[in-house]
Amino acid sequence: MPVVTRLIRLKCVGLRLDRSGLNRRICHGGHGESTRRRVMEELSSLTVSQREQFLVENDVFGIYNYFDASDVSTQKYMMEIQRDKQLDYLMKGLRQLGPQFSSLDANRPWLCYWILHSIALLGETVDDELESNAIDFLGRCQGSEGGYGGGPGQLPHLATTYAAVNALVTLGGDKALSSINREKMSCFLRRMKDTSGGFRMHDMGEMDVRACYTAISVASILNIMDDELTQGLGDYILSCQTYEGGIGGEPGSEAHGGYTYCGLAAMILINEVDRLNLDSLMNWAVHRQGVEMGFQGRTNKLVDGCYTFWQAAPCVLLQRLYSTNDHDVHGSSHISEGTNEEHHAHDEDDLEDSDDDDDSDEDNDEDSVNGHRIHHTSTYINRRMQLVFDSLGLQRYVLLCSKIPDGGFRDKPRKPRDFYHTCYCLSGLSVAQHAWLKDEDTPPLTRDIMGGYSNLLEPVQLLHNIVMDQYNEAIEFFFKAA
């Protein structure tokens, strides 16, 4: 349908601009030639980016308006996560992929991770045969000198190494975890280390914040992190923080949601997060949630379901960091003394419970951020502190605009589903549901879950995007293996 005709059928006769970009204004005007001319004039005055934003908002608010005008039973159906259909879509993908996926031949560990993690988020597991097949396949992707390639016999690469390790951790159990060669992995990570402090994605490959994060995430999970891997890393990531506040892929690049998550998580894992300008980072991150209630990846870009995780996770991490440092969400003042004591008492109890075996690792400097606190989700956002993003609005966008009723999730309306967006939409949905999480054993309140408890997903470990139970199992396993 021509754009102008579709707009007239929506009775839209005007546009307005505000701080969040192009918004539509619905007016109940006529459908005559004068209306057509006004719409044509409005459209001709817009840039390509404005037109694209306008059309996305039309689609999104059309869905929202339909939902709001529907009866209760229809609303309930639209808001349901449709677990059975999601699992059917995921299981089919794990067993057999069509020829259209041949272009992703170098990303096969990613497909394993995206699908297995999505299944785990839904609280389900795969059968023994599928588990054994996945472990065997990923074992054939493991290089003879460490790391994992995109497929059997392919060049080891940090991105697919991260995906393979996360997939095996998600499967869990001795067979999966013991299949990872920690000694050769340590050698591989050292080989990827650059003298600048950063990491290269593969031998002679590009260097960016993705490489830094994936290397440190793997080293942290496998308990092989040391000073050689972390030396100079904070300097490199710090050089990638932009004037906007977010983090780019490399020095001088534009701030981007995915790189911001990678940079922030890596800095927390190496206990150097205080070196970042957290106020500026927080300001940039919260302004990426637009009128659609989903997140965009960069300034003046369209909403995308995958940033449900890449942007919401940094928002929660930052707010927990402020709680740890006794600041409010703006970092400009201290929270009340009583709340401060309550936080520290809770934190210390959790740390004593979780880290009895290695008290020497505790940081005695009360002003520094301890990565263990974020690791074990022992710091939480007090109810007296308002969330810095709209968690219910974000869930609304994912469930109404990204979810496909027959299974899977997508970028935005009119886009097809895929396993990548399914993984990160579900991951972000979990982050939004558990944003108020007091500890990993406390379920969120009903009011924090759009659609009720039937939509509740498993909580994720925010620094690795692994379901908490599997993360805890892996940490214990690799602690004993050291």
Swiss-Prot record:
One cellular component term from this protein's GO annotations in UniProt: protein farnesyltransferase complex
Reported consequences of knocking out the gene: Plants show an increase in floral organ number, particularly in the sepals and petals, correlating with an increase in the width of young floral meristems. Increased sensitivity to abscisic acid (ABA) as well as salt (NaCl) and osmotic (e.g. in response to mannitol and PEG) stresses in term of seed germination and roots elongation.
GO MF annotations, alphabetized: geranylgeranyl diphosphate synthase activity; protein farnesyltransferase activity; zinc ion binding
Cofactor binding mode and count: Binds 1 zinc ion per subunit.
This protein's name: Protein farnesyltransferase subunit beta
Cofactor(s) this protein requires: Zn(2+)
Family: Belongs to the protein prenyltransferase subunit beta family.
Spans annotated as Disordered: 329-372
UniProt lineage: Eukaryota, Viridiplantae, Streptophyta, Embryophyta, Tracheophyta
Species, as recorded: Arabidopsis thaliana
Subunit text: Heterodimer of FTA and FTB (farnesyltransferase). Heterodimer of an alpha and a beta subunit.
Gene3D superfamilies hit by this protein: 1.50.10.20
Keywords: Metal-binding, Prenyltransferase, Repeat, Transferase, Zinc
Record keyword Zinc present: yes
Gene (UniProt): FTB
Residues annotated to bind Zn(2+): 304, 306, 421
Matches recorded under InterPro entries: FTB, PGGT1B-like, Prenyltrans, Terpenoid_cyclase/PrenylTrfase
CDD domains recorded: FTase (cd02893)
Catalytic activity: L-cysteinyl-[protein] + (2E,6E)-farnesyl diphosphate = S-(2E,6E)-farnesyl-L-cysteinyl-[protein] + diphosphate
